[in-house]
């Protein structure tokens, strides 16, 4: 994938992560992103950076890896998506094509519903977003995962529709 298509996939993965956290009533305060690059970057001869060898003995550009801490434990899609894309932009080399992306929620805990009130966050807006996420989740559960998608899921290079039709990463 090109860097822009990979950023779109990271956005979709973050949205899926948000749905999973919301469904299980969990929150996270840390996200980890790992991006593996395609070997064609080295094979073409243009790459001069740090390399690593995969389990097949092929030379690849060294994978990008990063973690971001969220201000407070959350399952709000706006925060998870924003921080995931920012992390992607910070750790990746835009000149390289991407082969593999892993997004992980760390330090996952039950959503106790207790939040520290401060002057910098609009709690009414956050509650509205939580209700919207739950409504979206209810629609997806009732009518299927592809019943409610963002317009970006129809862009070229988006994988959400195909991913929703898979079970364990395989065609259903």
Where are these regions (language model features)?
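Basic, low-complexity intrinsically disordered segments
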Residues: 1-172
């Amino acid at each position: 994938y090109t860097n822009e298509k990979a950023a779109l996939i990271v956005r979709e993965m973050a949205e899926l992560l948000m749905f999973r956290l919301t469904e299980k009533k969990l929150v996270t305060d840390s996200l980890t992103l790992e991006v593996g690059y395609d070997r064609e970057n080295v094979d073409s001869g243009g790459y001069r950076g740090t390399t690593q060898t995969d389990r097949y003995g092929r030379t690849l550009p060294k994978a990008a890896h990063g973690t971001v801490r969220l201000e407070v434990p959350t399952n709000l899609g706006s925060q998870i998506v924003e921080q995931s894309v920012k992390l992607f932009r910070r750790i990746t080399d835009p000149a390289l094509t991407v082969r593999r992306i892993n997004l992980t929620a760390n330090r996952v805990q039950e959503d106790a519903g207790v939040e520290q009130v401060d002057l910098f966050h609009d709690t009414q807006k956050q509650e509205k977003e939580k209700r919207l996420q739950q409504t979206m989740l209810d629609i997806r559960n009732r009518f299927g995962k592809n019943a409610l998608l963002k317009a970006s899921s129809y862009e070229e290079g988006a994988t959400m529709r195909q991913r929703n039709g898979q079970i364990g990463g395989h065609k259903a």
